[in-house]
Amino acid sequence: MNITTWGIVGILLMFAAIIGTGFWISNGGKPYNTGIFTLHKLITIAAVVILALMTVKTHRTSGLNTAGLAGVITSGCLLIGTMVTGGMLSVDKVMPSIVLRMHQILPFLTTLSTGITLFIMK
């Protein structure tokens, strides 16, 4: 497959930066620091685009096996859940505590799932 070890390390470092800026945002409290919040979102968008390009390239060159496809779907669903809960937390309304708890857990599950998926696709 076409995913290099450096590609996996790069994506996982981006995920670490996303989680790190997320901690930075949460420790700052509301209203969120616009600069850090924007950085958090931009790193996330970059990671999603790079992951999508890596997945498409792998699929076009050698195809995705069943495990790779299952991993992509699982990671995608976890990533969507992470983004939805993050979006819910960023609005001015008070959200149920389960939303915060999910947003604290989902990024780690997303990182784990994505790392395993990239390793499978390698």
What is each model feature region?
Residues 1-122:
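Membrane-embedded alpha-helical bundles that constitute the cytochrome b-like, heme-associated redox core
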